[in-house]
Amino acid sequence: MTAFLTTDQVAAIHDLQSGQPLRDRAVLAGAVNRALTGWGDDLLYPDAEAQAAVLLVSLCQAQAFVDGNKRTAWVACDVSLAINGLRIVDVSDEAVVDLMLAISTKALDESAAADWIRTHTVVAPVRRRP
């Protein structure tokens, strides 16, 4: 079963890296919860990579924060993957900037973002607090 970030957790991620306020909590909740879209027990986004991609794209494009939307989206995606035993590897800062700009300008959709994530992730042990 996939673990999902909550709206409060994503807001906390934002608060750690930006002094700017939340613009719209409902917009944030909608972006965070898109990965949970489905029918009954069947999710529209079938795996952790697709769920991280929809979180990444939704947060980046929804503009729920006054500032820091792309940074928050990237960190939330990374945390979402980590809590599901995956880790992004061998990616330069420039590649991340290019990815985020492509998403923010809608040149890259959720499916392409999921493919990018799958290409750059490896299975990693989930770290639990003692």
Give short role names for the model-derived ranges.
Residues 1-130:
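FIC/Doc superfamily catalytic core
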